[in-house]
């Protein structure tokens, strides 16, 4: 059996890591296509080595652009790749423009399409990710859902017969990374002289929070007003936006820092008092590590983190400060995202449903 995985952004490569391992263990031929949707200096050889990801077989080098330009460029390039490899499955990951392009190319050329992380819904149609994930689910021959909530969304949309719950592959990666750290010191703590448990780790990147200068300024001011240091792992795009509008990302308690490699990020979150983010991935990672999280959004796809008390949605400066300052949540043994073996189930389901 042959699978072609299409990925283009760092979170997708993290999800790819356990899939690559499981495919190799099952003797499945696995072709990795890197669209180059996001230029990310963290996607270095070290990143691939740390997570055990094989080097991509194909680099498209699409780069940045508007949603239409980027999606169209990826779509145009994928047609020839799929025809060359004639896969038994095209595997699309998550909710990026690379995801949507892979879906459209696969179905137009009549190659079976599987969607990993299917069924997630924010119900916010302003988010480009929401369009991408909904369209990909409805194009897919097999929807690989991470949670029971996601399965419910798929059933509600008439996709129950083509859906299966496998768990969350991010859980696989996180548990492996956590265990490999085994009490090792955090690079961030050592570099900045931080006291473990007495600082917050933050990431802010969504357009709703960064494209409007007034919105970005009020978030920065709120984080800067907190009692403990807030280390903002700022993407170059956010740094450029802030600089263009005279917004200081190092003010009060707020300290801007470059993004971290995945193992270093997990070590930093483990050492922190809490996480503050608008990222879907970090909300879930914080929950799995049992680190409190504040999400600067009015909604989340990962509703289990909120229902179990480890994540609070906060959209105004006042809500952000109150949420970050809240007491530690009640302990829970709940495991809504699986047991760390989702990738094995993904490969097993692809083999089982092979046409």
Each model region followed by its residue ranges:
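Active-site and donor-binding regions of nucleotide-sugar-utilizing enzymes
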Residues: 4-7, 13-24, 47, 59-158
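Donor-nucleotide binding loops and adjacent catalytic segments primarily
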Residues: 37, 45, 65, 182-271
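A nucleotide-sugar donor-handling region in carbohydrate enzymes
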Residues: 38-42, 61, 139-211
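Leloir-type glycosyltransferase catalytic cores
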Residues: 48, 149, 312-355
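Glycine-rich phosphate-binding loop signature in dinucleotide/nucleotide-binding domains
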Residues: 81-88, 194-195, 271, 353
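A donor-sugar binding/catalytic signature common to diverse glycosyltransferases
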Residues: 92-93, 143, 267-305
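Nucleotide-sugar donor-binding patch of glycosyltransferase catalytic domains
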Residues: 287-331
């Amino acid at each position: 059996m042959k699978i072609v995985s299409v990925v283009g952004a760092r979170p997708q490569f993290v999800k790819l890591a356990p899939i690559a391992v499981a495919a190799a263990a099952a003797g499945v031929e696995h072709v990795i296509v890197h669209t180059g949707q996001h230029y990310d200096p963290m996607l270095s050889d070290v990143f691939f080595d740390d997570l055990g990801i094989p080097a991509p077989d194909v680099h498209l080098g699409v780069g940045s652009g508007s949603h239409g330009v980027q999606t169209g460029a990826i779509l145009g390039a994928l047609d020839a790749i799929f025809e060359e490899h004639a896969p038994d499955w095209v595997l699309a990951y998550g909710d990026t423009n690379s995801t949507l392009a892979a879906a459209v190319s696969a179905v137009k050329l009549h190659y079976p399409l599987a969607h990993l992380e299917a069924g997630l819904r924010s119900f916010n149609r302003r988010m480009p990710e929401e369009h991408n994930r909904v369209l990909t689910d409805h194009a897919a021959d097999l929807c690989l859902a991470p949670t029971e909530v996601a399965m419910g969304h798929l059933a509600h949309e008439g996709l129950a017969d083509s859906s299966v719950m496998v768990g969350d592959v991010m859980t696989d990666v996180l548990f492996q990374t956590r265990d490999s750290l085994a009490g090792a010191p955090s690079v961030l703590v050592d570099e900045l002289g931080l006291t473990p448990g007495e600082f917050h780790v933050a990431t802010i990147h969504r357009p709703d929070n960064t494209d409007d200068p007034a919105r970005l300024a009020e978030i920065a001011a709120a984080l800067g007003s907190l009692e403990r240091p807030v280390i903002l792992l700022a993407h170059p795009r956010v740094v450029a936006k802030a600089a263009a509008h005279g917004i200081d990302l190092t003010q009060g308690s707020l300290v801007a820092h470059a993004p971290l490699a995945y193992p270093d990020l997990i070590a930093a979150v483990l050492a922190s008092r809490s996480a503050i983010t608008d990222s879907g991935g970090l909300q879930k990672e914080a929950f799995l590590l049992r680190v409190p999280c504040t999400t600067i959004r009015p909604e989340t796809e990962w509703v289990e983190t909120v229902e179990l008390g480890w994540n609070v949605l906060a959209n105004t400066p006042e809500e952000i400060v109150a949420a970050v300052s809240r007491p530690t949540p009640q302990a829970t043994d709940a495991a809504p995202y699986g047991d760390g073996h989702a990738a094995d189930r993904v490969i097993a389901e692809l083999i089982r449903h092979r046409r």
